[in-house]
């Protein structure tokens, strides 16, 4: 187990091999969506994005480029999105926190390629970043062919004016304004002042 970025939460690290095969076997997601919908809730499932998942994975055995697995992994995401759409889900949040890291150009290119392929899938997609600002990846994130972008204003409030300038008007902008990492109450008046700028 490894720490999830700079949090006190841990996750099981995926172990990846050059001949890795992927299949969709996680029914719990779809069962929980059905249950929530049956209770009358609007559902927005959250999944770890394909690039973040590969980035965090560990090579097992002989070294290889983890991005070589992307073309095998993307159809699984397509299956997930198709099944969620068939259940009546309108939006899916795709967490890509590695967009807040200093990424090699090869990974930036992979983001563009992956999301160009995923844009064909039937649900609306909100790419979410957190733990830091987008920095040099702001243009990349704003330009991805998705329906919305979530940014962290608690850790990186300085990115707000720039993202307002760069994000196309037809995209939804979601703002992380409540600090979930401490016990202190959020200053709602201050948050409202920030939100009114959008």
Predicted regions and their residues:
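Domain-level signal for soluble alpha/beta catalytic cores
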Residues: 1-198
């Amino acid at each position: 187990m490894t720490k999830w970025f700079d949090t006190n939460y841990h996750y099981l690290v995926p172990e990846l091999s050059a001949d890795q095969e992927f299949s969709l076997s996680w029914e719990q997601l779809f069962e929980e969506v059905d249950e929530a919908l049956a209770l009358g809730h609007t559902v927005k499932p959250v999944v770890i994005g394909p690039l973040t998942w590969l980035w965090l994975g560990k090579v097992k055995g002989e070294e290889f480029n983890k991005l070589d697995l992307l073309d095998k992994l993307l159809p699984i995401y397509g299956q997930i999105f198709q099944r969620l759409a068939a259940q009546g889900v309108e939006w899916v949040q795709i967490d890509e926190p590695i967009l807040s890291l200093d990424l090699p150009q090869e990974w930036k290119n992979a983001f563009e390629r992956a999301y160009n392929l995923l844009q064909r899938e039937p649900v609306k997609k909100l790419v979410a970043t957190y733990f830091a600002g987008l920095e040099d990846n702001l243009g990349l994130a704003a330009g991805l062919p998705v329906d919305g972008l979530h940014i962290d204003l608690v850790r990186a409030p300085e990115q707000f004016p720039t993202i307002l300038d760069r994000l196309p008007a037809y995209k939804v902008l979601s703002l992380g304004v409540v600090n979930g990492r401490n016990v202190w109450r959020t200053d709602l008046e201050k948050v409202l002042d920030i939100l009114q700028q959008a």
